[in-house]
Amino acid sequence: MSDSPFELEFTSGDTSGVMIDEDELKKNAVHKEAKGGTELMLEGLKKRLDPELWDNFNFIMSRVRDEFIDPDKPNILWLQDLPEDPESQHLKDASSRERFAKIVFNSNWQQQQYYMKLGVPYEDGVVLKNCCERFEPHEKPKDDKLRLVYFSTPHRGLHVLESAIRHLETQRDDFEVDIYSSFKIYGWEEQDKQFQELFDRLGELKSVNYYGTVSNETIRGALTKSHILAYPSTYIESSCCVAIEAMAAGLLAVVPNYGALTETCTDYAWMYNWESDPSVHAQRYAGILNSALDSYWEPALQQILKLQAIYYNYFYSWDMRASQWTTLLTGLKAEFDARPKRQKYPY
């Protein structure tokens, strides 16, 4: 995994089933039409929990308002945000934390950050990692070009990828890049306008297929035919559903050691040192992608990718996570029911 041999000039601007009712959408989604990772996690949990157990709790996803608190049920705060987020600052106060039966973190990295930066005690929370539906074992296509895929929002590194691919095209033509990226996934289609120049530049690249926002079902189908996750992230994430899903599908993840990607991707990914300068980042990324394309079909790497798929389809599956959620909530319900009715919280 060598650094890029190319001298790059950075050119792009730095610019499923169960329905959640309207009240839950208003409370837990950034937009009522949003279908990002937060919304998929909430819908996925409701789909798999015993309905009676679900109805005994009030779930709040990251953003808390006083009117969201239910005094008659245990309140679960399920965090997907960072501690630096303005919406998280209330957790500095013990009186605010006391409103929740449990604070659920999506990674150990996230819990540690909330402890160090906001003083959220470890005993107030629990880590239940994000997850995805299992992928059936499958073989990657061998009779065509290697397919790279990017399926996150435009502001999370797409500009770095565009610059890297532009220069990689001058060296080889044995790959294609499928890009599924738009703020429409959050119901914020207007935000795409600031990235139109970037989208136009992507349209100039012969190896790039730009699809915008599509359903998660479509993404999952595409992942079974893809080989490499091309995700030069420039956005600190507390967990990464993109990486989880791609690695469960057996893709080679080429990602930086940024935020919780180190925990999510572990040693299976081709991980490199993150660069703050976009031009340097693009240069480094072009080189690593070049090496990944050269190495993809090597027997040792193929064996690792098979082990990776087994690992992620087990440890990051909804089968495991739903069982963990059931255990947590069953215990919390028993504690809640044993309290005097006049004392439901603080917990």
Predicted feature residues:
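N-terminal pre-catalytic "stem/leader" segment of glycosyltransferase-like enzymes
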Residues: 1-66
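Nucleotide-activated donor-binding/catalytic signature segment of Leloir-type glycosyltransferases, i.e.
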Residues: 192-214
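Donor nucleotide-sugar binding/catalytic pocket of nucleotide-sugar-dependent glycosyltransferases
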Residues: 101-115, 120-137
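A charged, aromatic-enriched C-terminal amphipathic alpha-helix characteristic of glycosyltransferases
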Residues: 35-40, 276, 280, 297-340
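Conserved donor-binding/catalytic core segment of Leloir-type glycosyltransferases
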Residues: 140-157, 162-165, 169, 178
